[in-house]
Design a protein with these regions (language model features):
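Conserved beta-strand/loop scaffold segments within soluble protein domains that form the structured core
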Residues: 1-178
């Protein structure tokens, strides 16, 4: 689905945190979708997040919507350079009849850290695909998620971690509440 996002994407957002900069307040990206009366609607949000060495950012990405009959197909690419830390909170709270597919590609360098938290509630189908590359020693990834599901709602979490070198750490923990 990342290829479909690339094919239909017209614009996106770029966030770059400079070397040695600690952003003191969380940054929120709010994706708002609405269904169409005349037929299905697809949105293709795209974000590129780049943390330079020794920087820090808390990022909240939230998906909400009105109506029904829409599909969100998002891609987020995150590059975390040496000694940088990204705390990434992804909240999927689309409407009950929406579908939300997301692809997160995370690239970590030496002694960098990614702390990811994903929450899902109220959406018919959510599919998160997280692919992480631990490319240099000391890189650390922690990914946690919780889904609160009712009736026919579904949440699918796919995680692939590439331990490219020694002395890297990854942890993941997901729970579903039905």
């Amino acid at each position: 689905f990342a290829s479909i996002n690339s094919a239909f994407m017209k614009q996106g957002i770029i966030v770059k945190v400079s070397r040695d900069k600690q952003v003191g307040v969380p940054l929120q990206i709010l994706n708002v979708s609405s269904g169409g009366d005349s037929g299905p609607v697809m949105t293709v949000p795209r974000a590129y997040i780049h943390l330079e060495p020794s920087s820090e950012l808390k990022l909240i990405v939230k998906y909400v919507g009105e109506g029904s009959n829409y599909f969100v197909n998002s891609v987020q690419d995150m590059v975390i350079e040496d000694n940088a830390t990204l705390t990434h909170i992804q909240i999927e709270a689309d409407s009950k009849d929406a579908w939300n597919f997301s692809k997160n590609r995370i690239f970590l360098k030496r002694d960098s850290k990614y702390l990811g938290y994903q929450t899902v509630s109220g959406t018919r189908l959510v599919r998160n695909h997280n692919e992480v590359w631990l490319n240099e020693p000391g890189a650390e990834m922690e990914l946690n998620g919780v889904s609160v599901l009712e009736e026919d709602e579904q949440s699918h979490q796919f995680v692939r971690v590439h331990h490219e070198v020694e002395n890297c750490t990854s942890h993941q923990y997901f729970k579903n509440i039905i």
